[in-house]
Amino acid sequence: MKITALSAQLKNPDRINVFVDGQFRFGLDIRQVVELGIKVGLELDEARLNELELESQFGKLYVQALNYCLLRPHSVREVRDYLWKKSQPKLLKSGRKTAGLPASLTQRVLERLVAKQHLDDYHFAKWWLANRRLKQGVSLRRLRQELAQKGIDQNIIDQLLAESTRDDATELQKIIAKKARRYPDRDKLMRYLASQGFNYDDIKQALTDNHHDN
């Protein structure tokens, strides 16, 4: 079997259609075409074509995952979950079910994102702590829980929380300023603040400082 034509895709000129014996077989990124030595006239057996089809799937999935990472910083666990969903079989409108992607392929995408420094749990956690509900207010306990749920190592969480300039006293004042009108009753407001992860003594002090004595 022989590669008989290469052509840029209309919707994505950076991706190249590869034709084998006059029939479309798969698409590859321009970078993959160069790295894999793909050219018209190249003769390949079925086993090699199957390998190249996996490379095609890898290139497509990597671009999707990269675009996902560029939307905002993500943790490794978030992207692993994203890739898992992308790799599952899908039911087409025709009723046909697509084959899922092998776990080795999604792991390879994840490893490349880490190697290219598009994924870094430390920098993600630092960004999360600096920006999460900055105006609305959030307890450090809630931030700790959120980071743990996103797969961040406990040592990283401890280090960054110790270095953070955010503190519960300031965060409480932010929330009280926004929620006091909704919870005019002091006890109800205290229960709400406790549900957000603040401890009782800090809540009492914050309400006293805020002259919320109803």
What is the predicted function of each stretch?
Residues 1-214:
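An alpha-helical, amphipathic repeat domain used for nucleic-acid recognition
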